[in-house]
Amino acid sequence: MTSSYVGRFAPTPSGYLHFGSLVAAVASYLDARAVGGRWLVRMEDLDPPREVPGAQQAILETLERYGFEWDGAVERQSERFPAYAAVVEQLLRSGLAYACTCSRKQLEGFAGIYPGFCRDAGHAREDAAIRLRVPELEYRFVDRVQGEVRQHLGREVGDFVIQRRDGFYAYQLAVVLDDAWQGITDIVRGADLLDSTPRQLYLQELLGLSQPRYLHVPLIVQPDGHKLGKSYRSPPLPAEQAAAPLTRALRALGQRPPAELAQASASEALAWGVAHWDATRIPRCATLPEERL
């Protein structure tokens, strides 16, 4: 079976894959393969100072050990900086973006909503971040799992950074450009990125890019409420007996694998997942406690 579906898994090499990463990878892989679609891997290595040496290779080796097979070459955002730079220049020339010299201290107390201090200041680009002007509009989309999401960009976000003061490019810009460049039709990822999706919709609209379908899976959280992640020293995935974590990930996604699947090979566990994938079973919630899985 062939399909126009193109999905992707885009890990950040600031650490190794953990169980939360696996849940997102399984969801994106099965959603693509269940309809005969393509599944790409992209390294979101936008922030070299935070990258852990050897993490990129370790991530790819883990995916292989866990039975994942991707299509095409692995793309890296660090190789796409000229494309990002061209769009930043375009937005600056058109007056849709501007230089911002605000420090973190100046922005304390604004709950992450940019108050517009530099919007009409006319600062030079040197030693400044670049922010995108946002409209006083509400953006909405229907997530395949989380349902309708609404966000007023002006009131809830404010003008947001597309290039940092240190010269590195912001995730919001890079992810929109790369998804369009790679022809991604369906984005399956963790619910921690649900809130940033309206900013991406605005960028897509501004740049005349097509809008993918979105599916945000619940985040796996630790007993203290923090998501499983590299920042909280979540343990890396075990190198052996991959079918057991894969089976657990299937259960986290609301699928119903037989108990004996945990003793199978990784490729058999994923093949079962492809054959039985039902995205409507994914829990409609933002978080899932790890201890309940």
Swiss-Prot record:
Motif ('HIGH' region): 11-21
List of residues binding L-glutamate: R8, F9, A10, P11, T12, E44, Y171, R189
Superkingdom to which the source organism belongs: Bacteria
Residues involved in ATP binding: K230
Enzyme nomenclature, EC number: 6.1.1.-
A cellular component annotation (GO) from this entry: cytosol
Cofactor note: Binds 1 zinc ion per subunit.
Cofactor(s), by name: Zn(2+)
GO BP: glutamyl-tRNA aminoacylation; tRNA modification
One Pfam family cited in the UniProt record for this chain: tRNA-synt_1c
Motif ('KMSKS' region): 227-231
Family from the record: Belongs to the class-I aminoacyl-tRNA synthetase family. GluQ subfamily.
Protein name, UniProt field: Glutamyl-Q tRNA(Asp) synthetase
Taxonomic source organism: Pseudomonas aeruginosa (strain LESB58)
Recorded name of the encoding gene: gluQ
